[in-house]
């Protein structure tokens, strides 16, 4: 059995000192992995709280930036996103981030993905929420393609993108009705 834990990348504990202490402690422990969350921000006067989100989550450090940080301050432990909301980011840029993280960490990154749910975040980013599943699947397809080729096509424009992505394990989060079929198609766990 593998055991991981979430490290808060939000609220008052989202400081370099706390993150490095937690990551190094986990690296020296018997834990297998550490995980961070993803939100861009929260609406002011956040009053609809379907998932127990704290208002402190408005102060959240970016999970991909933290992954680079973890790569630099640890040597053994795997680390991942629980979950990275793929529709919030351009697909090609996400692939580049993942390739960079995998290179810096010598392949220790774990990619947990999801489609997101906060209407306000989608509107603020100019991403149609109704297209989140489609965007998510297109991004996952590009991630899979990046494992097999240095030439990727985005918006009908082929580009050589290096370093080639070392395949991270892909974990699919979300509501069972949509997440389970997606997990069976493209997920690793």
Where are these regions (language model features)?
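Active-site-adjacent structural elements that line small-molecule/cofactor binding pockets in enzymes
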Residues: 1-189
């Amino acid at each position: 059995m593998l055991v991981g834990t979430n490290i808060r990348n939000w609220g008052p504990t989202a400081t370099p000192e706390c993150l490095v202490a937690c990551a190094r402690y986990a690296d020296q422990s018997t834990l297998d992995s550490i995980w961070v969350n993803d939100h861009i921000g929260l609406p002011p006067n956040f009053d609809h709280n379907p998932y127990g989100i704290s208002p402190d989550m408005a102060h959240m450090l970016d999970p991909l930036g933290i992954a680079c940080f973890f790569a630099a301050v640890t040597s053994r432990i795997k680390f991942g996103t629980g979950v990275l909301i793929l529709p919030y980011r351009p697909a090609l840029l996400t692939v580049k981030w993942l390739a960079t993280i995998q290179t810096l960490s010598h392949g220790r990154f774990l990619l947990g993905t999801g489609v997101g749910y906060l209407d306000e975040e989608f509107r603020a980013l100019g991403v149609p929420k109704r297209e989140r599943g489609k965007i998510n699947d297109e991004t996952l397809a590009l991630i899979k393609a990046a494992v097999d080729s240095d030439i990727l096509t985005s918006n009908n424009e082929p580009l050589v993108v290096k370093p080639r992505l070392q395949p991270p394990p892909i974990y699919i989060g979300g509501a069972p009705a949509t997440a389970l079929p997606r997990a069976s198609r493209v997920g690793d766990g």
